[in-house]
């Protein structure tokens, strides 16, 4: 299956990923609200595409503001961004941590359906509005909430700790822990180059040594420490999805755009445990669909944004994409392949661990990061995009490998 119409992304924008680690953040002092992030991200995209009058449709991606912020009906914030968006078709989408990816997929399908030539997509989440114990309960809705009562107090860290335990037993703990620590090191080093990253100001030394801190099951989970986990984040990301007609309407050159050439979506039963805890099998399906639609192999990818909600998830994602065989993802990382100078740079602004994880924004942030890379707008975060490898991929995962969106992009 091929895309039947040219689809592009342009004018990406990220707010700061706010939370612990940023000097601006203080849990007891005023800080931006949900609508502030929506407005900042949306306005900045509109300023690059010629204004609200050029927009046909709008999509807002948000996981669960109805609990974090007691706010629903988020699509109605688009006219708040700009009165010129009043009476435009607007919709809100949700799919746990893959919400942003679903927002992108929704916009892409509007372009393909020819109901729109320009779609504004905004992903947003504000999560530092509640104490951690309540936040853990809210986030558990990304899984099957009926498991919450008998599940781990730290619901999702517990899920991926269980996966890590199985992985350690099958493939060896020492090597895997070293790779998890290296992943953390790379994430922070990349975040230090990106001014909007939550870990931009991280000045810790001996990052790998820190990341090898022994897990404390009494205080947290059995097989992960806090450095293995993405943080709680507030922020928004936005991008415009356009047709060729939309490019002309917005006055944007193709050199400032990237083309979408592959889309893969997959879903797994929320009520069922993973059949193969050692693998991200739903991720495998979505990635294959995206690569098949693009008509390329993974070896043609210049960079990848993967969903590293936990360091063990990054190792398993590398295997799911096919860069390493099952059990060999650790060696792939330890050989330097995923670093900035490596064979295939991953998560060049820090990923979920380094840049941050404002849940509904994450999939959109991945697309913005890749747009910056493929158009040469990444600043200090820029990596080489060889002429023979003009493609990139994002993989956005919701829940414990339940909701997946993978996209393949091409440099214009």
Language model segments and positions:
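Short beta->alpha junction loops
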Residues: 92-97
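Short helix-loop capping/hinge motifs at secondary-structure junctions, enriched
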Residues: 246-250
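Conserved beta strand-loop-helix elements of the APE1-like EEP
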Residues: 236-244
């Amino acid at each position: 299956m091929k895309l039947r119409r040219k689809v592009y992304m342009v004018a990406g924008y990220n707010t700061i990923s706010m939370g612990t680690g940023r000097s601006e953040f203080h849990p007891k002092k005023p800080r931006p609200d949900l609508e502030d992030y929506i407005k900042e991200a949306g306005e900045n995209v509109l300023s690059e595409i010629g204004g609200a009058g050029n927009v046909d449709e709008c999509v807002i991606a948000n996981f669960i503001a109805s609990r974090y912020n007691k706010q629903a009906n988020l699509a109605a914030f688009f006219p708040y961004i700009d009165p010129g968006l009043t009476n435009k078709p607007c919709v809100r989408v949700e799919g746990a941590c893959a919400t942003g990816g679903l927002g992108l997929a929704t916009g892409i399908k509007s372009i393909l359906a020819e109901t729109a030539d320009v779609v504004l997509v905004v992903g947003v989440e504000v999560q530092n509005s509640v104490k951690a114990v309540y936040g853990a309960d809210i986030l558990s809705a990304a899984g099957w909430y009926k498991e919450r009562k008998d599940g781990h107090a730290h619901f999702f860290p517990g899920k991926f700790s269980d996966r890590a335990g199985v992985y350690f037993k099958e493939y060896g703990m020492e090597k895997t822990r070293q790779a998890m620590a290296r992943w953390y090191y790379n994430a922070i080093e990349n975040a230090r180059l990106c001014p909007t990253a939550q870990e931009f100001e991280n000045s810790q030394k001996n990052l790998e040594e820190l990341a090898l801190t022994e897990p404390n099951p009494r205080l947290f989970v059995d097989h992960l420490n806090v450095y293995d986990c993405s943080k709680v984040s507030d922020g928004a990301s936005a991008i415009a999805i356009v047709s060729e007609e939309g490019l002309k309407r917005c006055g944007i050159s193709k050199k400032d755009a990237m083309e979408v050439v592959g889309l893969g979506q997959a879903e797994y039963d929320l009520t069922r445990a993973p059949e193969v805890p050692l693998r991200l099998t739903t991720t495998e399906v979505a990635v294959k669909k995206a690569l098949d639609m693009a008509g390329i192999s993974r070896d043609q990818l210049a960079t990848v944004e993967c969903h590293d909600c936990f360091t063990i998830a990054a190792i398993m994602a590398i295997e799911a994409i096919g860069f390493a065989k099952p059990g060999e993802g650790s060696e792939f990382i330890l050989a330097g392949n995923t670093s900035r100078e490596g064979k295939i740079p991953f998560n060049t602004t820090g990923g979920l661990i380094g840049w941050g994880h404002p849940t509904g924004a994450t999939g959109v942030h991945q697309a913005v990061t890749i747009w910056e890379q493929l158009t040469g707008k990444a600043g200090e975060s820029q990596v080489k995009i060889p002429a023979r490898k003009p493609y990139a991929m994002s993989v956005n995962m919701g829940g414990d490998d339940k909701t997946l969106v993978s996209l393949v992009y091409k440099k214009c």
